[in-house]
Structure formats: C-alpha cells, structure tokens
C-alpha cells in the first residue's frame, strides 16, 4: 500500500514538473517573441503583427495550441475569400466590451494568429480572421467554439489552385469539427452552403431580396455547377457573383433554408445600406454605414456569428450601425481639404461589386488604380480581364494606372474603351497619388482602387504624411 502511495505521489509530482517545464518554456518563448515585436516597431519594419508569430512558430509550433487554450471563452474563427477582415471587425464592434484576442491588422496566416494570441495577455475570447488556405492548420491548433465560412471565390490561382481544391480542404475541416462547434455558412454560396448540410449545429445565412438580383449570373461567376451531380444550377436570384438562390433541376440540390437573412434591402450609394435582419431570436431594422450588397453579406454573417457567441439582437444592431470601415475597405482618408476613398480590389468578384457600388453613386471622373503582383496579390494578374471595368470606364475622364503591373492595367483600360491619352501610366505609387490629388479639386475626393500590397503601400504613404495613424495603433 505504501509502495502504491509512493508511486502515485511520484506520478503526480512528475505531472506537476512537466507542466511547470512546459509553462516555463512557453514563458521564455513568449518573452523572445514579444521582444521581436518591439524591435520590429522600433526599426520601423511594421507593427509587429507577424514577426513575433514567425519566431514563436519556429521555436515551438505547439505554443499556439497552449496560448489558444488559455482563452476563458474560447475562440471564433472567420474565413472567406472576400470580406473576412470587414466581417471580423463588425463582430468585434458588436461584442464591444469583451476583451478580444483579435487580429485586427488583417495578419491572417499562422504567424499572424500566433502574434495575436501572444499579444493578448488578458483576453477573454479569440476573434480570428484566417486566410482560407491557412484554415486547416489554424483549426487544428485553435479548436474554435464557432467557425464562420463566408464565401469562396477564384483568387490567387498561382497560390491556392482551383476553387474546388480549397472547397475540399474546407470540407475536411468541417468533418473534423467537434459536434458542439457552431458552424455558420453562407447558404448563398453553393460550395460553402453545402458544407454544413449534415451537421445539426449549422446556421446558414444569406440575402433574401430578389429585387437586388442581377438579370443574369456574371460571366466571371465561379460556382455555376451543382456540387452533387455537376449539372448547371438554375439561379432564382444572383446577388454577388455566384452568391444567390440556386437549385439544380437535375438532382434537386438547392440553397439551404436561411436562419439569418437580410430582407427589404435598400442601397444608398456610397452612403450605406439599410435592411431588415431576420434571426432565430427576432427581427430588427439595421442602417449600415457601409455601401454595397457585399457589405450587407458581411453584416449578416457578422450578425450570425455574434448571435452564436451570445450577443443580443439589440447589441448586433447597435454594433453594425456604429461600424466604421476596416482599413482599405471603403475607407475615407482626409487629406488637406480633399479626401481619398480607398476601395480594395483583389479578384473579379470583389472588383465587380466595388464597380457596381460606384456606378450606383455615379462613376467618378478621375480614378487611380494600382495593380501589384506580389505573392499576397497573386503573381497571375490575368484576372483583370475578367473584371467588368467597362461601366466604370464609360464615366471616367482620366485613369492613373500605377503599381508593378501598371502597363498591363493601362492596356486593359484602353481595351475597355478609354482613350489612350486618358490613361496616365505612373508605376511609382507615391507619384501617382500626388498626381491624383493634384487633379482632384478642393473639397473633392480621389477614388483609389488598389490591390492588397498596393493598399498597404498607400497606407504607409499617408501614415508618413501624418494623415492617418498606423493600423496597429488604430487597432
């Protein structure tokens, strides 16, 4: 008996010692990574949103698991091709007073997630925007209590491969989720809406207002064919790209019933949108400060996730109505008596919706478009030929083409009907910005359409000039 007690005591002490060693190791690794973040900021290399996470990942990939496990209320994860930064920011606004581990800078790869968890020492809840390609690794390590999958569009084919490849990886992710994990899916996306069909804890969301359907599905739409039998879908309503109300007349596969939806949508150009938000907990009218149908999608997804995390309908409405744009996404920047309106474009579906929103407000006479081909943009820029630029160019008097691929962008504009002498090619973004502002009258607004890395470069310029604070200080 005494021997058994000795063995039990030894085993208990071994567990305590192992946990102490693990905790001590994590503490040392965390100190090193936080020091890297401070050095990054002091050196002007950014906000320390990825470097600490890269270091922590190299030192110990399991540290992410340990940091996530410390969150008292667990974590929620948001992934999508388009809108994940805005949707996550909306959820943060709705949750308001909760202490969040939130990657508000948009650093959404594994390194950014690690940096976020490392920096949020007293956080209650993780709120993590995750790159669609990084989702499997993040889910394995964070084990969220709620997962929002908002859409899949063709984007960065050189990096991700075909859309179906990402969809299959997501399907495997969903199959591995614990039954208690809340799954929220955009029911209007055929690839995404089907992911939760066999799960009890699935909440489909979407739009329910055929008045805003396009006359026909866009030629650049990505999911035209039934995910079950491969036959073409019939779209009863097509809202944004391939998002809409669909059914297969061959096998009967169709959009799932929406549990959270936007109805009675009214678009007010660049001034925003209003809609009736329908949820299992009731219905409320929402006046959204952001424009465009795709921001209504973002808002409905955010509402669905916030409700799954315990937010009241009143909190959801209040949060959405006071929401300001995420950086680079319909962000207005005052510049000495003028302003810059920044609208991120990165793939055909997103760019077409930006153009649609600008059209509704009257296409601007002056545009600055910046096209880069860095890894984060996608090396293959052939997607610009799938964008319906023509309606925007029809109202333009001058376009300044900038970025790494300014020459190809200028060619696309001339093929779109703009006279050659109406296109100025200025690859250097700072000079292009100065030229655009010089052509903008006092009190006027310069509309800038940048790809992702061009948007970051633009922000560096306006930060250096003192027009805005760095995004990591705004967070």
Residue spans of the language-model regions?
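ATP-dependent carboxylate-amine ligase
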Residues: 5, 13-53, 223, 230, ...
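Phosphate-binding loop of NTP-binding sites
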Residues: 17-206, 210-225
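Short glycine-/acidic-enriched loop or helix-start segments at secondary-structure transitions
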Residues: 88, 112, 136-138, 158-159, ...
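Buried hydrophobic packing segments
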Residues: 91, 95, 113-117, 299-309, ...
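Acidic, Mg2+-coordinating active-site environments of NTP-dependent enzymes
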Residues: 149, 153-338
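General beta-strand structural signal in soluble alpha/beta enzymes
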Residues: 100-105, 128, 184-186, 204-205, ...
């Amino acid at each position: 008996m005494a021997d058994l007690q000795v063995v039990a005591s030894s085993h208990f002490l071994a567990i305590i010692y192992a946990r102490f060693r693990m905790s001590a190791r994590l503490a040392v690794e965390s100190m090193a990574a936080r020091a890297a973040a401070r050095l990054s900021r002091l050196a002007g290399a950014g906000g320390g949103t990825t470097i600490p996470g890269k270091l922590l990942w190299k030192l110990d990939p399991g540290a992410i698991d340990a940091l996530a496990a410390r969150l008292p209320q667990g974590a929620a994860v948001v992934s999508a091709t388009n809108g994940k930064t805005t949707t996550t920011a909306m959820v943060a606004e709705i949750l308001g007073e909760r202490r969040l581990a939130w990657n508000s800078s948009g650093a959404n790869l594994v390194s950014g997630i690690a940096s976020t968890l490392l920096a949020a020492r007293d956080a209650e809840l993780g709120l993590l925007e995750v790159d669609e390609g990084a989702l499997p690794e993040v889910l394995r390590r964070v084990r969220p209590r709620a997962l929002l999958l908002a859409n899949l569009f063709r984007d960065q084919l050189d990096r991700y491969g075909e859309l179906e490849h990402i969809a299959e990886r997501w399907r495997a992710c969903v199959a591995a989720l614990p039954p208690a994990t809340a799954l929220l899916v955009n029911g209007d996306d055929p690839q995404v809406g089907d992911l939760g069909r066999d799960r009890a804890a699935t909440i489909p969301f979407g739009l329910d207002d055929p008045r805003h359907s396009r006359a026909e599905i866009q030629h650049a739409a990505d999911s035209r064919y039934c995910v079950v039998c491969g036959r073409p879908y019939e779209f009863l309503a097509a809202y944004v790209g391939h998002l809409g109300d669909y059914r297969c007349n061959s096998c009967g596969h169709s959009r799932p019933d929406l549990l959270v939806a936007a109805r009675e949508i009214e678009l007010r150009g660049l001034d925003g949108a209003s809609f009736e938000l329908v949820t299992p907990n009731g219905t409320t009218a929402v006046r959204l400060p952001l424009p465009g149908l795709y921001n209504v999608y973002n808002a409905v997804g955010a509402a669905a996730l916030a409700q799954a995390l315990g937010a009241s309908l009143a909190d959801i409405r209040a949060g959405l109505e006071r929401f300001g744009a995420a950086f680079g996404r319909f962000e207005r920047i005052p510049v000495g008596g003028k302003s810059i309106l920044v609208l991120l474009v990165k793939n055909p579906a997103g760019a077409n919706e930006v153009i649609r929103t600008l059209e509704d407000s009257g296409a601007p006479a002056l545009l600055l478009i910046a096209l880069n081909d860095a890894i984060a943009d996608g090396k293959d820029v052939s997607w610009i030929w799938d964008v319906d630029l023509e309606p925007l160019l029809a109202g333009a008097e001058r376009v300044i083409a900038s970025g790494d691929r300014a020459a190809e962008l200028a060619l696309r504009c001339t093929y779109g009907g703009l006279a050659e002498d109406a296109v100025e090619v200025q690859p250097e973004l700072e000079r292009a910005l100065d030229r655009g502002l010089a052509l903008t009258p006092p009190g006027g607004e310069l509309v800038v359409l940048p790809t992702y890395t061009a948007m970051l470069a633009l922000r560096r310029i306006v930060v250096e000039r003192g027009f805005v604070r760095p995004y990591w200080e705004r967070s």
